[in-house]
Amino acid sequence: MLRIGLTGGIGAGKSALSSAFAQCGAVIVDGDVIAREVVRPGTEGLAALVEAFGRDILLADGSLDRPALAAKAFADDAARQTLNGIVHPLVGARRAEIIASVPADSVVVEDIPLLVESGMAPLFPLVVIVYADVEVRLRRLVEQRGMAEADARARIAAQASDEQRRAVADIWLDNSGSPAELVQRAQQVWNERIVPFAHNLSTRQIARAPVRLVPPDPEWPAQAQRIVNRLKTASGHRALRVDHVGSTALPGDPDFAAKDVIDIQITVESLAAADELVEPLLAAGYPRLEHITADVAKPDARSTVERYDHTGDPALWHKRIHASADPGRPTNVHIRVDGWPGQQFALLFVDWLTADPDARADYLAVKRSAEQRADGDIDAYVAVKEPWFRDAYRRAWDWADSTGWKP
């Protein structure tokens, strides 16, 4: 099952986008619909709202007077938090019931108005944000929903900012134009990204990126942070730390080209802990690569942990690796044991290359040579680089020893 979190500001067009995805074949779980369901007359949700905000939020027939509740609940932050504290747990429980009832190979789009504000984005393998300019949203709310302009502005101001939404968005769909334009964009995203992603997940396949160096993408840091947040959530207590590593983690050098693949390292206390992550990471969008079980061992393995320093035990280079099923964001997820040489070198390598422009230039030259000689074959690309890495391992640790580096 591929679960997609969908959100956007009030008036941006969440319902329209949900409808477009439903026409494509998605199962829609609408947070607004559920939010109404859990506060119907006779529910514990409505009783809790009355206790918190008073009986004057009820209509004569005992149902919820939504404008009256909104006037109180959006008056200040404390009132809004009270509202969210009552409604969100009930909505979450009902959402879980619905999702548990659908087929396992479904694409489930969860329309959640406050996905960003409630910190739920890392729970989803993919987050879609529908966007419209504030003035466009304001006009829709006033003209189509009959809101007073002051109320509409207050509702907009009470929600997350565009910057906060961008920070969690894997896909950003502009709905400032016509309904037909939004439908076209939704269908394109569905066919080019969502369907392949769902297929890869159901078959436990990964999305492979071309073996091609590209200029640094200014979006890499933000993309990596979203992945880190997602993996921390999926790994829970098993992850001692989660880091952006590899070439895309190097800051500030506009000439340092890299493959368009994000590398992430999850540090765990043991390989047994890594093996407990197979299903949680699959659910998060990252199937395991069963055929890769170790890094290439280096002689005189080094570590800042004394019992692992200057060792020759090849078992200390064992690891687990997962990769993204999302064709829109190829990612490698290396799971290594805390203090083992491979875990330490992944962290050291980024810091060393960041600090040493000559080493950075050397590595770029090796990568360009490997790209040319590999002719699109990832195994050949890795093999061409390996002799350089054997020497780089020693150079990096010489730098670490001279600077007092710690992970």
From Swiss-Prot:
**Gene3D superfamilies on file:** Beta Polymerase, domain 2, P-loop containing nucleotide triphosphate hydrolases
Pathway entry? Cofactor biosynthesis; coenzyme A biosynthesis; CoA from (R)-pantothenate: step 5/5
GO terms of biological process kind: coenzyme A biosynthetic process
Location of region: UPF0157:
196-407
GO MF annotation, one: ATP binding
- The residue ranges of the DPCK domain are 3-201
InterPro entries in UniProt: Depp_CoAkinase, GrpB/CoaE, NT_sf, P-loop_NTPase
SUPFAM superfamilies cross-referenced by the UniProt entry: Nucleotidyltransferase, P-loop containing nucleoside triphosphate hydrolases
Q: Name one GO cellular component term.
A: cytoplasm
Compartmental location: Cytoplasm
* Main localisation: cytoplasm
The residues that hold ATP are 11-16
Q: Which CDD domains match?
A: DPCK
Which reactions appear under catalytic activity for this entry? Answer: 3'-dephospho-CoA + ATP = ADP + CoA + H(+)
Keywords in UniProt for this one?
Answer: ATP-binding, Coenzyme A biosynthesis, Cytoplasm, Kinase, Nucleotide-binding, Transferase
EC number(s) recorded for this UniProt protein: 2.7.1.24
Question: What is said about the domains?
Answer: The C-terminal UPF0157 domain is involved in the proper folding of the full length enzyme.
Q: Which family does it belong to?
A: In the N-terminal section; belongs to the CoaE family.
Against PANTHER family, the record matches this protein to: BIFUNCTIONAL COENZYME A SYNTHASE-RELATED, DEPHOSPHO-COA KINASE-RELATED
Per the entry, what this protein does is: Catalyzes the phosphorylation of the 3'-hydroxyl group of dephosphocoenzyme A to form coenzyme A.
- What is the protein name stated in its UniProt record? Dephospho-CoA kinase
From which lineage does this chain's organism come?
Answer: Bacteria, Bacillati, Actinomycetota, Actinomycetes, Mycobacteriales
